Amino acid sequence: VAVDSVGSVSFGGAPGRRMIPGLGTSVPPVFLDESYVDDLIRVEEPDPVLACRRLAARGFLFGGSTGTVVSGAGQWLAAHGREGLTAVAIAPDLGERYLDTVYREGWPEAVIESEVPAPAMARPA
């Protein structure tokens, strides 16, 4: 299962604005062999931010690409999950390069133009 951001043309589709550093492509990759792709999940930009913040609340500091993978895997499992199904995801980046973007308070709302709620486990009681 491939996971990509909305606005990326990696797997076709309309190009669009992407604000999370490192997500998607503006040009279709020449090395991509789509015969290996069984399914495609496209993730909206607020979702990886929320996934990263949820993981950070549990002690894991991952980057925007990993947040996209985790979000996409969760979407795929929600649609296709069944008892005993196991998913494996690749975490391609860590979060230290995203401290001024994904993890900075107010950044998603200002740049992505979408409200990203704080994950429940990170909210004060």
Regions found by a protein language model. Give the residues of each.
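A short, charged, Gly/Pro-tolerant segment at domain boundaries
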Residues: 88-98, 104-105
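Nucleotide donor/acceptor-binding cores
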Residues: 84-86
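Short glycine-rich anion-binding loops that position phosphate/pyrophosphate groups of nucleotides
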Residues: 8, 67, 93-95
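Active-site/ligand-binding loops adjacent to catalytic centers
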Residues: 1-64, 80, 102-125
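A short, acidic, amphipathic alpha-helical segment used as a generic capping/interface helix at domain edges
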Residues: 48, 70-79
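Short glycine/serine/threonine-rich phosphate/pyrophosphate-binding segments
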Residues: 65-73, 98
